[in-house]
Amino acid sequence: MNPNQKIITIGSISLGLVVFNVLLHVVSIIVTVLVLGRGGNNGICNETVVREYNETVRIEKITQWHNTSVVEYVPYWNEGTFMNNSEAICDVKGFAPFSKDNGIRIGSRGHVFVIREPFVSCSPTECRTFFLTQGSLLNDRHSNGTVKDRSPFRTLMSVEVGQSPNVYQARFEAVAWSATACHDGKKWMTIGVTGPDSKAVAVVHYGGVPTDVVNSWAGDILRTQESSCTCIQGNCYWVMTDGPANRQAQYRIYKANQGKIVGQTDVSFNGGHIEECSCYPNDGKVECVCRDNWTGTNRPVLVISPDLSYRVGYLCAGLPSDTPRGEDAQFTGSCTSPMGNQGYGVKGFGFRQGTDVWMGRTISRTSRSGFEILRVKNGWTQTSKEQVRKQVVVDNLNWSGYSGSFTLPVELSGKDCLVPCFWVEMIRGKPEEKTIWTSSSSIVMCGVDYEVADWSWHDGAILPFDIDKM
């Protein structure tokens, strides 16, 4: 075959392949059109149908592709609307894990803040973990001495729930060594307490900017909840303490609307002590279970009405839930008086379920280790000892710490009741371990309609860190 014949042959083959390729594309287009025609889509490949609902909480987005429909639920919230939060608490049978940040494990090699007092609060579209930093990172020399509660370096910051308190995702909220935060449906409100012990100031932030202040009125370490405040129909409520930690102090309830204080009430509680209240909305009121750092091993209860009237007493249950505490068998409960005659204490929580109560406590009676939650029949209204459910969250071989409450709003959960949730802080480092620092991580649990098995969701960091060996 001469060169000209070779060129003609190669050209003919190439032309044939091109024609064949064009025919394949034509067939593919015809088949696609026929398939779409059978699907009844009138030839539209992608169609988005938006359906409006009476509740402005979701958009139903239907994407049709060939003969398959994919339904996505897109969260939507009108930011010009206050949350209701006047619903009742859901009745639950157990608590399932919601999130765990593993901050200390990650912080051995990551840029994670040294923190204490983490807590969770939710808006209509998200939950966030708030925490008080020490202005330093784990495994860094500035972490030395961070066992101290109050310093000018402490700040309130937040991340999306489940994230570690890392420098890349954290959002600054306030300068604070004591704090609370909550969302009214429109914006976040945070309260950060800072300054000298005798003249501390609480700065109210709304939407990220300062809007009001509370100055210390007793001159003795003004402090607040270290957990979520509570917003109901646009008004937000929180509790503050000023005065001694080991004898009679002074207590106040505050009410704010869009970051401006619109009311306050002194709580008369002679012989009782209130600190670090864990509050939540229930049936249009604010229910708080607090810490008695003076004498009681039972917990103070404060129920706040929208007009700032209140009822104050103690959790009636015949089982103690503070730490340190005595034996369960030797404890007799009281709805009105401190019982147990044990000083000191730890922040804790409880949830009313009708006349029952879910109450959290450390497993150890003498130290902040282990954590369990008990349901006590009629424990909200009577000195009952009858446990109808118990769930272990952290075993007694591992450290725990503070614990507190919050709820999932109906706008977020899609339920017609408020889902009760709690968090448990797991403190590591000083004073119990040989480190130069003190920090914590947390596990978060939310109520479900099923019983949940015992397990230990403990911190799990291996100590000491490199900085502790220098």
From Swiss-Prot:
Residues 11-32 are annotated as: Involved in apical transport and lipid raft association. SUPFAM superfamilies: Sialidases. It comes from Influenza A virus (strain A/Duck/Burjatia/652/1988 H3N8). Its EC number is 3.2.1.18. Ca(2+) binds at residues 292, 296, 322. The gene is NA. One of its GO terms (molecular function) is metal ion binding. This is Neuraminidase. It is found in: Virion membrane; Host apical cell membrane. Residues 89-470 are annotated as: Head of neuraminidase. Catalyzes the removal of terminal sialic acid residues from viral and cellular glycoconjugates. Cleaves off the terminal sialic acids on the glycosylated HA during virus budding to facilitate virus release. Additionally helps virus spread through the circulation by further removing sialic acids from the cell surface. These cleavages prevent self-aggregation and ensure the efficient spread of the progeny virus from cell to cell. Otherwise, infection would be limited to one round of replication. Its main location: virion. Its cofactor is Ca(2+). HAMAP family: INFV_NRAM. InterPro entries: Glyco_hydro_34, Sialidase_sf. It holds the Pfam family Neur. Residues 36-470 are virion surface. One of its GO terms (biological process) is carbohydrate metabolic process. Disulfide bonds join 90-417, 122-127, 182-229, 231-236, 277-290, 279-288, 316-335, 421-446. Inhibited by the neuraminidase inhibitors zanamivir (Relenza) and oseltamivir (Tamiflu). These drugs interfere with the release of progeny virus from infected cells and are effective against all influenza strains. Resistance to neuraminidase inhibitors is quite rare. N-glycosylated.
